[in-house]
Structure formats: C-alpha cells, structure tokens
Amino acid sequence: MYGGKSAEHNVSLQTALAVIKALNTEKFDIHPIYITEKGEWVRGARLTEPVSNVKMLQFEQGGSAFSPAALNQEMFPQEASQQNEAIDVVFPLLHGPNGEDGTIQGMLELLNIPYVGNGVLASSAGMDKVVMKHLFAQVGLAQAKYAAFLKKDWTRSPKESCEEVEQELGYPCFVKPANLGSSVGISKCRNREELQKAFELAFQYDRKVVVEEGINGREIEIGVLGNDDPKCSVVGEIAPKTDFYDYKAKYEDGDTDLMIPAIVTDEEYATISDMAIKAFKAIDGSGLVRADFFLTADGEVLINEVNTMPGFTPFSMFPLLWKEAGVEYADLIEQLVELAKERHAEKQLIKHTF
C-alpha cells in the first residue's frame, strides 16, 4: 500500500518500488494498492513481472478504483466471499499524514487485517512532533529545548511568536511542521527575517509548528526492530554536505554522506540504544522505528525524534543500518511481515466481552 494524500507521496512511491523489487515472488503474492494524491484508491493486478519504475506503480492504465471499506472483498472478490482466501498482511509504505499518522492503521484495525509496522497510537504519536516530545519528556529522555505554535497564534501576533522563540531558544533554530517527515517544510533560521519566512512556510503544511533550538552536534541514527522485545541495529551518522539534511539532500541530490557504522564509544552506543528502546516503548511501538539523535562534543546524547515508517529507498538509513548488523534487505522485510502476524495473533486473544 503506497502513495497517499500527502506531501510525501513521491517518497512513498520510491519506497514501494524498492520493497516490491526485493520481495520474493515465489514466497509472496504481491497485490499493489495505490492511493492517489487526491486520495482515490486504485488496485492493480497481482504482480507477476518485475517492476522497473514508479510509473508502473501508478496504474495510469489497467488499475481499478475500489472502496477501502471492503478491502478483502475488493482484492479477492470471489475468494473472500467463499472465505477461501483473504489478505494475509498489508505492508503500508505510506509516509506523512493520511498514512503514517494512524489513519490507515485505524482502518486496518477496524477491518481486522494484519499490517506491518506501528499501530494507531504509536503512528499518531510518532507523526506529531509535539506529542512525541511530550512523551519523551515524561520518560526522562534528554532532548533539545523546543516551543510549539498553532497557526492561530501566528496569525494573531507574528511578533509575539518570534519574540518567544528568540527569548526561549535563540538562534540558530529549526522550524518544522509538527506532522510531516522527510524534512518537508523545515527551515534553519539565523535571524528574525528567516524565522518569519520559516513560520509562513511551515504553516502551509500544518496548523501546528514546532521550533527547536539548534544543537551543535553529530546527527546519529539507529534502527529499532521488534514488538515487545525490540532490538537495536548499529548506529549510523548523517554528514550532509549542505547546511542541513533537507528533502533535497535526502531524496534528490544524494548530497549527503552516510557513515555506517558511525564511530562512537561503547558507552555512547549503550546510551543511544537504551534511549532508542525507551522512546520505542514510550510511543508503544511495534515492528520498526528509526530513532534520531544528536551527539555533542562532550558526549551528551539528545533524542531528536523517532520515525515510525522510515524510508526504504535504496539509500535510506534504516535498511542500511540493519544490513551492517547482518540483516539483508529482503530478510528485513520478511521479519517485518512476521512481526505483523505475531502482533495480530496476539490481539486476537484479547477478550471483547465480559
């Protein structure tokens, strides 16, 4: 399942292409579900031939629209009615709002269909950077100072919003839409003029914005895999050649060095992995999470955020971290499918009557 009504639509297509290429077609029957930028659901025929580009996944010809409310029946109209066949697992490869934020996960829960990755709570908390930061604070995770603003606050008094940032955080700072990933709508600000422009940009993508103090430190990331007993990968480091790791550097230029594994001490790795698992449990994670940190020159570790559906593009950090840890891409995907089935089976044991 990929695409979606989100600013990260194209990222999702790239992720879907990479995952589909890696799936073992002798082991899995692959049925693509494309959600257009307008939010329309289109299903394609079972994939029996290799997919070489994202255009093939957009079904400009040959796809058929369907209602997501009857997902099993739409995908297997005859078989499902006879209860001979149904969807085993949905793999949501959706990024951003209307996909990674708990909405799709809620629908799949109502339909009682197993799905890869985080549930409703973890997905929504992981999408909203403000809620996420509140949860991290509650479990005692060190993080950079931040402030949150609603669009109505900015509209009412841009001057007050800017003054609050300057007094509480100072420059440089980073302005981000609260509910977007892939560095969409993010700006680095060094003065009032840049801050005003950054607010205006971020509010184009969300009604809520978070502003974070700038941290002078290395950008370290780690992968978390599992359900109630999660494990961590090696750590990696992002060294962007640009001013910061924005959308263009991530997905277009490749103008970033990924150092895997990152050079850290045993003590620093222990701290990072422990904090990553605490963050995973704080949002009630399942399946996978990529946790992002800052590591300062004096060894202080600050959590930045978690991503509940990290990218699976060929140059994405999450699969590369696990590859370095000894888990190949195709095996990683199969583990995620098994974790989805495990979590779903556990939920089926829950009583709903008393």
Curated annotation (Swiss-Prot):
Q: In which pathway does it act?
A: Cell wall biogenesis; peptidoglycan biosynthesis
- Domain ATP-grasp, chain residue ranges per copy: 133-338
User: Which keywords, in A-to-Z order, does the entry hold?
Assistant: ATP-binding, Cell shape, Cell wall biogenesis/degradation, Cytoplasm, Ligase, Magnesium, Manganese, Metal-binding, Nucleotide-binding, Peptidoglycan synthesis
An example Gene Ontology molecular-function term: ATP binding
Which residues bind ATP per the record?
A: 166-221
Q: Which reaction does it catalyse?
A: 2 D-alanine + ATP = D-alanyl-D-alanine + ADP + phosphate + H(+)
Q: Which GO terms describe its biological process?
A: cell wall organization; peptidoglycan biosynthetic process; regulation of cell shape
Can you tell me which residues bind Mg(2+) 2? 305, 307
The cofactor binding remark recorded in the entry reads: Binds 2 magnesium or manganese ions per subunit.
Answer whether the UniProt record assigns the keyword Magnesium to this protein. yes
CC cofactor: Mg(2+); Mn(2+)
GO cellular component, alphabetical, reads: cytosol
InterPro entries referenced in this protein's UniProt entry, alphabetically: ATP-grasp, ATP_grasp_subdomain_1, D-Ala_lig_Van_CS, D_ala_D_ala, Dala_Dala_lig_C, Dala_Dala_lig_N, PreATP-grasp_dom_sf
Where Mg(2+) 1 binds, per the record, is at 292, 305
Does the entry annotate any disulfide bonds, and if so which pairs?
Answer: none
Cellular compartment(s): Cytoplasm
Pfam hit, one? Dala_Dala_lig_N
Q: What is its EC number?
A: 6.3.2.4
According to its UniProt entry, the function of this protein is described as: Cell wall formation.
Q: Which NCBIfam families match?
A: D_ala_D_alaTIGR, PRK01372.1, PRK01966.1-2, PRK01966.1-4
Q: Which family does it belong to?
A: Belongs to the D-alanine--D-alanine ligase family.
Q: Which PANTHER family match?
A: D-ALANINE--D-ALANINE LIGASE, D-ALANINE--D-ALANINE LIGASE A
- Annotated protein name in UniProt: D-alanine--D-alanine ligase
Q: Which organism is it from?
A: Bacillus subtilis (strain 168)
The lineage, from the top, is: Bacteria, Bacillati, Bacillota, Bacilli, Bacillales
Give the gene that encodes this protein: ddl
